[in-house]
Design a protein with these regions (language model features):
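Thiol/disulfide oxidoreductase modules built on the thioredoxin-like
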Residues: 109-113, 121-166
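N-terminal "domain-start" segment that seeds a small globular fold
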Residues: 22-54
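Short, Lys/Arg-rich N-terminal segment immediately upstream of the first membrane anchor
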Residues: 1-8
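Hydrophobic beta-strand anchors of alpha/beta hydrolase catalytic cores
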Residues: 63-64, 91, 137
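Structural microenvironment flanking redox-active thiols in thiol-disulfide oxidoreductases
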Residues: 75-111, 121-127
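Short active-site neighborhood of thiol/selenol oxidoreductases, capturing the structured segment around
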Residues: 52-75, 81
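Short acidic-hydrophobic, aromatic-tinged amphipathic segments that line or gate anion-handling sites
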Residues: 44, 116-120
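Hydrophobic membrane-insertion alpha-helices, especially the h-region
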Residues: 9-26
């Protein structure tokens, strides 16, 4: 009986390692390709504030969240990103081809979401970054990319990535 349990445990650990490896490979394959001046390009939020990613990530890591109003998976990730923002985490979001500023603002208010948004109405930012999947999350610290992932990510997954960027 004990040997059977050990075998199941060993096989479970092997399966877990294979799944983790596959997830890491998929993240590497879908990782954004950043343009040369990505950190110093001025970007404007819906509130009219002009920001650069270098400035946003200078003092503390920033979570960049590429999302879309039409993205099915984003409906699960967006509330968790808003929760991080309400807890004081440094968050900037980019709305990918989700309409004009009024439409994006209306969508945000309808969903009860409050976080800063850069509207990428025509997809120029996402094209220059080679973002092919929504949602995509990028953690930056001091102007450099620390981690990227795409697809569904849990609150704790995002929190852990930000903690890692702050700590190391």
């Amino acid at each position: 009986m004990l040997s059977k349990l050990r075998r199941w445990l060993r096989e479970g650990l092997i399966l877990l390692a294979l799944l983790a490896g596959a997830m890491l490979l998929m993240d590497a394959w879908r990782a954004p390709q950043l343009p040369a001046s990505f950190d110093s390009t001025p970007l404007q939020t819906l509130d009219g504030e002009t920001v650069t990613l270098a400035a946003l990530s200078k003092d503390e890591p920033v979570l960049l969240y590429f999302w879309a109003s039409w993205c099915g998976v984003c409906r699960f990730t967006t509330p968790e990103v808003a929760r991080l923002r309400s807890e004081g985490e440094n968050v900037m979001t980019i709305a990918l081809r989700s309409g004009n500023e009024a439409e994006v603002s209306h969508w945000l208010s309808r969903k009860g979401v409050d976080f800063p948004v850069i509207n990428d109405a025509n997809g120029a930012i996402s094209r220059s970054w080679a973002i092919s999947v929504t949602p995509t999350l990028v953690v930056m610290s001091q102007g450099r990319v620390v981690s990227t992932t795409s697809g569904w990510t849990s609150y704790w997954g995002m929190k852990l990535r930000l903690w890692w960027a702050k700590t190391f």
